[in-house]
Amino acid sequence: DPGDINGLDYIVPLTNTSKAAPTSTQDFNSYLYDIASIDPEVWRSRGVDGDMLAEQFITRVLADQTLDGGFDGYYGYSVATAKEGETVIGQGSVPETISALSALASYRDKENVAAAIEAGLTYLSSVQLADGSFECWGDTPNGAVTLSMLSLMDKLDISIDDERFVKNGNTVADAMRTFYVDGVGFISDFEVEAPLDDLSRLPVYENPVMGNYSTI
């Protein structure tokens, strides 16, 4: 019972809809994840309309969707706090778009959410790199972001061969394989500068698949 874990009630904070205010900068995605994870019967037993609660956070998440279809975590806040006559120009971020769409996935039966997800997927397709991977910031392939895209596709029941996410014959799974290093596992970033005779100074890499840590 999430309402009684070691004497703590983890449901109460989720009902604080003031955190979904237009000028708030909370992690709205996490609220949607948590709301969806609680059995509807639990909400009813607490006299809370889970759907209405989720709708308020959905509205706030959708406010962060930029004109290019992507998501920027501060776009909604910037629009809400802009001075009269001020134009806010937002640009989608790949990691933030994937995160937002993942949070919205459980609510895609709602028409407005489904439309937002489609726009977000169109954005992600447009910024996918030539080898099928995705970047974090800039144009450098990133293993962690590419893996999160694979997870999103699974949540949305999108085939790995969906033509929107195949670039030059490379699927997202093909791209993920390029981040595998023998003896290490999967790494996030190949952008490492170090003398070849001093590999001990290379940073520790996180294996996003196995949860292991190692160095080259």
Spans of model-derived segments:
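Structured C-terminal portions of repeat-based eukaryotic scaffold domains
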Residues: 172-178
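Alpha-helical scaffold repeats of the Armadillo/HEAT/TPR superfamily
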Residues: 9, 57, 120, 166-172
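Generic hydrophobic, aliphatic-rich segments that mediate packing or membrane embedding
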Residues: 7-10, 27-30, 57
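An alpha-helical repeat/solenoid feature that recognizes helix-turn-helix modules
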Residues: 1-2, 20-52, 67-118, 129-165, ...
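Alpha-helical repeat scaffolds
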Residues: 3-18, 51-54, 169
